[in-house]
From Swiss-Prot:
Compartment(s) where it occurs, according to its Swiss-Prot or TrEMBL record: Plastid, Chloroplast
Catalytic activity line of the entry: RNA(n) + a ribonucleoside 5'-triphosphate = RNA(n+1) + diphosphate
HAMAP family: RNApol_bact_RpoC2
Protein's organism: Carica papaya (Papaya)
Protein name as annotated: DNA-directed RNA polymerase subunit beta''
Entry's EC annotation: 2.7.7.6
């Protein structure tokens, strides 16, 4: 009784793990028999209490969490705001998906954490609570689904469905929720059936690998150890203790001068506590990895036997124990978890919160603005940033680590606990990322615009795939395509006034407009619209409107002045220079179109690239038709791969290079009608001219009708030509689809006269028996092998320096036999003449691979000229000159302060009159005299150059002006290339407001604005805008780009712009809900078409946001239909942590399969190590150390990975079991081919120790590298063929062994079992008999020590105050990567 009084009384909840510990202590102290008696009493007590409680479970026991309602409401509110942002174009689809998933994930997690406290407070004896938290049935996440919310589910592909299931199973699901939740339900049912067999097979393979490992010696004499440090923060204390208990020290441990533990001493709980309290230096322990033999293990490297708490006995079959103990919990592991699905784990970042209210300050030069992955604006800091928060009485300093996002602005007031920064999740956490492509489809049809320069993807110069350089909007301007031929095109927008006559406009009026076909963008110019009144368009010149059909962007200019010239239109990186004067234009209605110069984005031309092209008007067709090649050898320029890869992308245009002389064009009339339209003619019928085809379309030619149904439309073709019903004797009936040259044809015996032109013969079979032949007229085009350059350019152009050459090459734009389709009555260009740039390589001095081109703007004496300059570059050097600040030759508007305002981020240099100093040819693009206008090439490298600001003196000025006025657009181009235009009568009632309103009013006072403008006769136009003669009775011309010059009437200016900062400009894109006037209406999103004194006309458009690196499909100005792919985003998402979990994960690690294509593949890491170390250390040492290091590294990481999976499921396995198995996987090396040795064959797998020993014995380097074998491969690569054959592939293994004459020494357990011998383990182990005296003395010592260590432990039998054995593994454990072994300590 006296003894009992000394015992400490404990009163706490005890769970499974704690009971295990209790039992092991009891056995240590009292022995087996006594312990079993105690446990019987515990069992009886347990059943008795359970009977008395009588737990039953009903639906009423499922109590919903009260806070759920407002949590869900809050999340819905956030999603709604997000949806709005997406609609306004502030956030793109990927950001929206990410954010909504994180919103719901956080809500669901929060509910889950609320659940436990809620039960504890309201109903601690709730059966659901008791069951799940005692571990009897169900786990937290299942209970969460019953009483919280089911949360996010994943679809069968493992992708998230961003519609969360808000209800729980207690409330019941709606139909949609039920269907979504069925995706994941199947897995749970299948799991249980499959799980047992999987776990069994895993156990079998594990045992197979390690069955021969038996404890054969007491000490192998190794001096190695693996060091573990108690100071290491990455490892929780509990895991540290688990790692140490039961191990044997590899080295003495000193505390200052005093030795507190000696080598080969095994570690008990007392020693561990001492280590922790003393915070000793790193502790070196022996593990199965350090044991010096491969086929067995020694007692000291293994440590204590878990069964009876003593050093393991000799002859113990520890291999099989290890295999069993890893395989057995496999049945408890889930195969997959079905509750969270593929949540973006690792997606939520850590936050830094503000410690108190106050103003926040930081150095703005250390951060730069960016977007977070949710599309919010933020600052990114590269280095540690110290942030000061000043509250009234105290100043806080917060340091923000590098690569974090700062979510607040400088000098902003922050509340206490407000999130001020987001720390990027560290890269060390092994979140496997995968790259996902997401396509965004357009939901309306219309014309595509983008508000930034979109770069071409370099490989596909001729395709329509573009890469975005920076964040910008893509706009789909609404408007359908109406392809009728009677109504030429609808010139009317909603609410335009309209004359009744205008519908019956004759087609000539349109053909008389000069047409310029610039890649699907058709601009119609006419020199003077008022002349055309006779033609029946009476009303447009009176309207002062810009008429813009939604789809085709036909732009009309009303009453331009006679002397104004239409100048270089600029489109992304292409210029068109008109070549003839206006007088010519009036004589010849179809003018020659301009030469377009194409410059790549970076301005670098490779050899043989196309510099410019010219569309010859002789190869223009009005009608649709089919193109056939004659004697042309054509080869496609676009490589095959490009075409194949982008087959999904629409409208891929190939160019064919022409070798020879002629091709043919077979005209036909084509109408593309919507599906619903009723067609009044039958297929294969013959109609005359002007027949009604549908309600409002009449045919223009007579002939045969073919009707073809396409996906969303009907294509109706009318073939003109003669129809012949051939007799039986006619040979022509056999020819179908051939061209017949003139002079040969006998189409009919009656008409034997010779044909004048080529004809095309086509055989048509309306029914099976009848057929006839259609003879169609053909237009023949001859192609000169190269137009003489002199016809295109003046001769003085070619003063070639550095052997620059230009060749003229013709390209056919359509393939052989391809149908050529025109939209409306625009003409179609069949052949394009290109200038190909080349240069000589002969000079050794000019080993030039590429040339640089720039558009250069020169202003001389208030005249501004543009030049194209080509530089031969040898190196990538980039010289830029800083222009002089005070430049006397500044023209009026561009005063020396104003010049850098026009395009704030690029500066121009001025060349004064002293042009003669520069060598090289300079020719102006636009001479003022109308006769000669020429293209310029400067080919000297000592000219001048424009570059973006890097270190320019007035950098700060611009920075400040940006702060004052955020309206400045930052252009991403090679600098402003503008054109000069003469202005006749400039009225002074206009204000000319540039981008930067503030700076204008600062530099030119408004009162003297008027006279400035009267003086100037020329002024600069920005590259993106054009200002034409702005007198009030003419229209303001719409340009598809933002006009950077705003014309506002005086009163209009007051109404709108003083109150708000928004200035409406023509062509500007406006997002939805931008407030223009103080109490004006909220606008829909769109493009401003017309600005009048009191009104604005906006064409509706839908913005899509795209971030850098996204791929844009389609061309600028191209017509897109509903459902076409607009953009493809490539984004990284973390692999959801629980798609492969549990068993499959363990199996993946043990079989060494790569986890994902972009995983941190261990084998690759291993190879890298080997190569690097060999390079550093030379051959023999390199291989030895390289293989050693790799193996050590990969072993530690494998053990950690496997432990992580088991711990996350709450299963405790001792590290040493996993170590024994990992040791077998990593114990082989692969002989490599370098430095062939005579001993082993290349590609042979040998044991690491054997390789080392052989290397030492031969004194010759054996080249090998470490390799990870999976458990299956390791079982088939053992020393015993009998064991291999009994595992898998019996016939193959036995046949090979017979061929090689292998000998099996019957060392393992399995071979002996198969052959019925004595098993070499336990009592059958021979070594048990000879047990030397030295060993016995060691045994006795260790026994004594153990007794000493265990003595004082009964008093804290329910564990000391640290609650070491806290069974409930915290959630965090799942996420922290435990580095159980810190390094290799080779003492």
């Amino acid at each position: 009784m006296a003894e009992r009084a000394n015992l400490v009384f404990h009163n706490k909840v005890i769970d499974g793990t704690a009971i295990k510990r209790l039992i092991s202590r009891l056995i240590d102290r009292f022995g087996m028999a006594y312990t079993s008696h105690i446990l019987d009493q515990v069992k009886t007590l347990g059943f008795q209490q359970a009977t008395a409680t009588s737990i039953s479970l009903g639906i009423d026991d499922l109590l919903t969490i009260p806070s759920k309602g407002w949590l869900v409401q809050d999340a819905e509110q956030q999603s709604l705001i997000l949806e709005k942002h997406h609609h306004y174009g502030n956030v793109h689809a990927v950001e929206k998906l990410r954010q909504s998933i994180e919103i719901w994930y956080a809500t669901s997690e929060y509910l889950r954490q609320e659940m436990n406290p809620n039960f504890r407070v309201t109903d601690p004896f709730n059966p659901v609570h008791i069951m799940s938290f005692s571990g009897a049935r169900g786990n937290a996440s299942q209970v969460h689904q019953l009483v919280g919310m089911r949360g996010l589910m994943s679809d069968p592909q493992g992708q998230m469905i961003d519609l969360p299931i808000q209800s729980n199973l207690r409330e019941g699901l709606s139909l949609t929720e039920y269907i979504i939740s069925c995706y994941g339900a199947r897995k749970g049912v299948v799991d249980t059936a499959v799980r047992t067999s999987d776990a069994g097979y895993l156990t079998r393979r594990l045992v197979e690998v390690v069955q021969h490992i038996v404890v054969r010696r007491t000490d192998c004499g190794t001096i190695r150890g693996i060091s573990v440090s108690p100071k290491n923060r990455t490892m929780p204390e509990r895991i540290f203790i688990q790692t140490l208990i039961g191990r044997v020290l590899a080295d003495d441990i000193y505390m200052g001068p005093r030795c507190i533990a000696i080598r080969n001493q095994d570690i008990g709980i007392g020693l561990v506590n001492r280590f922790i309290t003393f915070r000793t230096q790193s502790i070196s322990i022996r593990t199965p990895f350090t044991c010096r033999s491969t086929s067995w293990i020694c007692r000291l490297c293994y440590g204590r036997s878990p069964t009876h708490g003593d050093l393991v006995e000799l002859g113990e079959a520890v291999g099989i124990i290890a295999g069993q103990s890893i395989g057995e919990p496999g049945t408890q592991l889930t195969l997959r978890t079905f509750h969270t699905g593929g949540v973006f784990t690792g997606g939520t970042a850590e936050h830094v919160r503000s410690p108190s209210n106050g103003k926040i300050k930081f150095n703005e030069d250390l951060v730069h603005p960016t977007r977070t992955r949710h599309g919010h604006p933020a600052f990114l800091c590269y280095i540690d940033l110290s942030v000061v928060i000043e509250s009234e009485d105290i100043i806080h300093n917060v340091t923000i680590p590098p690569k974090s996002f700062l979510l607040v602005q400088n000098d902003q007031y922050v509340e206490s606990e407000q999130v001020i920064a987001e720390i990027r999740a560290g890269t060390y956490t092994l979140n496997y990322k995968e790259r996902v492509r997401k396509h965004i489809y357009s939901n309306s049809e219309g014309e595509m615009h983008w508000s930034t320069d979109v770069y071409h993807a370099p490989e596909f110069t001729y395709s329509n795939v573009h890469l975005l350089p920076k964040t910008s909007h893509l706009w789909i301007l609404s408007g359908g395509s109406s392809r009728s031929s009677l109504v030429p095109f609808s010139l009317h927008k909603d609410q335009d006034q309209m004359n009744i006559h205008s519908l019956s406009v004759e087609q000539e009026s349109i053909s008389s407009l000069a047409v310029n076909n610039d890649q699907g963008r058709h601009k119609f110019f006419s020199s003077n619209f008022s002349d055309k009144k006779k033609c029946g368009i009476p009303d447009y010149s009176e309207f002062h409107r810009i008429l813009d059909t939604g789809h085709c962007n036909l732009i009309y200019f009303a009453s331009l002045h006679e002397n104004s010239d239409l100048l270089a239109k600029r489109r992304r990186n292409r210029f068109i220079i008109p070549f003839q004067s206006i007088q010519e234009q009036e004589k010849e209605l179809m003018p020659r179109s301009g030469i377009s110069i194409e410059i790549p984005i970076n301005g670098i031309f490779r050899r043989n690239s196309i510099l410019a092209f010219f569309d010859d008007p002789r190869y223009r067709r009005k009608s649709s038709g089919i193109l056939k090649y004659g004697t042309i050898g054509a080869h496609s320029i676009v490589k095959k791969e490009d075409v194949i890869e982008y087959r999904g992308v629409k409208k891929f245009k190939t160019k064919y290079q022409m070798k020879v002389d002629r091709f043919f064009f077979i005209p036909e009339e084509v109408h593309i009608l919507p599906e619903s339209s009723s067609i009044m003619v039958r297929n294969n019928s013959i109609i005359g001219v002007d027949t009604r085809i549908t309600l409002n379309i009449r045919s223009q030619v007579g002939g045969l009708v073919r009707v073809e149904r396409k996906k969303k439309s009907i294509e109706l073709q009318i073939f003109s030509g003669d129809i012949h019903f051939p007799g039986k004797t006619d040979k022509i009936s056999r020819h179908s689809g051939i061209l017949i040259p003139p002079g040969r044809g006998k189409t009919n015996s009656k008409e034997s006269k010779k044909l004048k032109n080529w004809i095309y013969v086509q055989r048509i079979t309306p029914t099976k028996k009848k057929y006839f032949v259609l003879v169609r007229p053909v237009a023949t085009y001859e192609i000169a092998d190269g137009i003489n350059l002199a016809t295109l350019f003046p001769q003085d152009l070619f003063r070639e320096k550095d052997n620059m050459q230009l060749r003229v090459v013709n390209y056919i734009l359509y393939g052989n036999g391809k149908p050529v389709r025109g939209i409306f009555d625009t003409s179609i260009q069949l052949v394009r003449t290109c200038l190909v740039l080349n240069w000589d390589q002969d000079n050794k001095s000019s080993s030039v691979e590429e040339v640089r081109t720039f558009f250069v703007e020169v202003s001389t004496n208030s005249l501004i000229r543009d030049f194209l300059r080509i530089d031969l570059v040898k190196s990538q050097s980039h010289i830029s000159y800083i222009r002089k600040r005070n430049d006397p030759s500044g023209s009026g508007l561009i005063s020396d302060n104003g010049s850098d305002r026009i395009n704030p981020f690029y500066y121009k240099e001025r060349i004064q009159q002293s042009l003669s100093k520069n060598h090289g040819t300079i020719r102006t693009l636009l001479n003022r005299n109308k006769e000669c206008q020429s293209l310029i090439i400067l080919s000297s490298s000592n000219c001048f150059q424009m570059g973006p600001f890097n270190h320019v003196k007035y950098h700060n000025v611009i920075k400040q002006s940006i702060k004052k006025d955020p309206l400045i657009p930052i252009r991403n181009s090679l600098g402003p290339v503008g054109t000069a235009i003469q202005i006749a009568n400039f009225y002074s009632i206009y204000h000319l407001i540039t981008h930067n309103q503030i700076s204008v009013t600062k530099y030119f006072q408004l009162d003297n604005l008027n006279q400035i403008f009267e003086v100037i006769k020329y002024y600069l136009m920005d590259e993106t805008g054009r200002v034409y003669n702005p007198d009030p009775c003419s229209n303001i011309i719409l340009n598809p780009f933002n006009l950077n010059w705003y014309f506002l009437y005086q009163n209009y200016h007051h109404n709108y712009c003083e109150e708000t900062s928004t200035i409406i400009s023509l062509g500007q894109f406006i997002c939805e809900n931008v407030c223009l006037a103080k109490n004006g209406p909220h606008l829909k999103s769109g493009q401003v078409l017309i600005v009048q004194v009191d009104s604005v006309v906006i064409r509706s458009a839908k913005p899509y946001l795209a971030t850098p690196g996204a791929t844009v499909h389609g061309h600028y100005g191209e017509i897109l239909y509903e459902g076409d792919t607009l953009v493809t985003f490539i984004y990284e998402k973390s692999r959801s942590g629980d798609i492969t979990q549990g068993l499959p994960k363990v199996e993946q690690v043990l079989e060494v399969r790569s986890i994902d294509s972009i995983s941190l593949n261990l084998e690759k890491r291993v190879e890298g190590w080997n190569k690097r170390i060999t390079r550093i250390l030379g051959i023999p040492w390199g291989f030895l150390i390289g293989a050693e290091l790799t193996i050590v590294q990969s072993r530690i990481s494998l053990v950690n990975k496997i432990q992580k999976v088991y711990r996350s499921q709450g299963v405790q396995i001792h590290n040493r079991h996993i170590e024994i198995i990992v040791r077998q996987i990593t114990s082989k090396v692969l002989v490599s081919e370098e430095g062939m040795s005579n001993v082993f064959l290349p590609g042979e797998l040998i044991g690491l120790l054997r390789a080392e020993r052989t290397g030492r014995a031969l004194e010759e380097a054996i080249c090998y590298r470490a390799i990870l074998l999976g458990i299956t491969r390791a079982s088939l690569n053992t020393q015993s063929f009998i064991s291999e054959a009994s595992f898998q592939e019996t016939a193959r293994v036995l046949a090979k062994a017979a061929l090689r004459g292998r000998i099996d020494w019957l060392k393992g357990l399995k071979e002996n079992v198969v052959l019925g011998g004595m098993i070499p383990a336990g009592t059958g182990f021979k070594g048990l008999v000879h047990c030397s005296r030295q060993h016995t003395s060691i045994l006795l010592e260790t026994k004594k020590k153990n007794l000493y260590l265990f003595e004082g432990e009964m008093r804290d039998i329910f564990f000391h105050h640290r609650e070491l054995f806290d069974s409930c593994i915290s959630k965090n454990l799942h996420n922290t990567s435990e580095r159980s072994f810190i390094g290799l300590n080779d003492s």
